Amino acid sequence: MRREAEAAAFIRDRTLLLLGLVAVLFVTLWRLPALRSSVVVYCAHDAVFAEEILRDFEMRSGVKVLVRYDTEATKSLGLVELLLAEKDAPRCDVFWNNEMLGTADLAERGVLAPHRGPGWERIPEQWKDADARWTGFAARLRVHIINTRNPATDLDDLSRGAIAKPLYGTTLTHYTALWHLWGPERLKTWHHESRARGLREVNGNGMVKDIVARGARDHGFTDTDDFFDAKDRGALVAMKPVRIDGASICIPNTVALIRGAPHEATARQLIDYLLSAEAEMALAKSKSRQIPLGPVDENQLPAEVRELREWSAKCVPLAGFVKDRVECLAWLKSEYTE
């Protein structure tokens, strides 16, 4: 009887162990697709707007999105430099930039791989790389934000104006456009004279918006999404488009596939989604009121976005300014490190 009991216990223990191993194996195999089905995104766009779009992609696709955001103070430039540093051993799959020229520079340096999906096809030629290494979508405009309690009568008088430090983000794009269209010497003179006359530099477009909204400055240079944030909070502000020789500065988001991306298949899925009419319409209807670049149902666009589309009809051709950006940034770095 004792031997029979011991044998039964041995069989029971072995059975439980086997069942446990089977359960562990089942859970592991069940999780493997989820572990494989992920995508790593470096995102310079504001998290408050990007998060909703990325979570919607997760729900639709079942792909887990792992995001690394940048800070307001080093917007876009920090991630561009990180991607350059990781070029030989990439950790990122998709770069969602909040401007065009930094992405185009990465393409020239061999960091990006081509992707000709349905999203690339629907975006007009002026907003995408001919070799499909990057594509623009959902644009913003550079604008003057004006405090209407004490409205500036002369926006060229910058003694009560504000601007973000031009080393990064859309302010760097703004400076690059001036570098190309005015020439380096005129821009350098304007930069030095504006600072001498009292133009206040701060650490980001959001801070420009804040100090104008509370009346610490009468007007400033910012982007349309920051203007709408101030307006929606009840600030007494108005805006006018920044124009250079009659052309506005329209700055799209851009998306690109990283060369050697660890999760290439899901990266291509995400890029196609970001470049879809659905994603552009979602960003147009969001609080940022971004301008769709591809075809969408015009009747669904908010009135404010339709007005922005009119302002952007004639805009500076930024795509050809990559060399200017490199030169302008080199000068700016020398200015701010002396």
Question: Language-model features: where?
Answer:
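N-terminal Sec-pathway targeting helices
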Residues: 4-25
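Early extracytoplasmic/lumenal segment of secretory-pathway proteins
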Residues: 17-20, 30-102, 338
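Extracytoplasmic ligand-binding site segments that recognize negatively charged/polar headgroups
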Residues: 44-51, 70-77, 90-216
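A ligand-binding cleft/hinge motif common to bilobed small-molecule-binding domains
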Residues: 101-105, 213, 218-238
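Periplasmic-binding protein-like
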Residues: 122-125, 139-140, 191-195, 201-202, ...
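A bilobed periplasmic-binding-protein/Venus flytrap-type ligand-binding module shared by bacterial periplasmic
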Residues: 143-149, 179-180, 251-266, 282-283
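Mature extracytoplasmic/periplasmic domains
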Residues: 258-315
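Extracellular/periplasmic bilobal clamshell ligand-binding domains
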Residues: 298-338
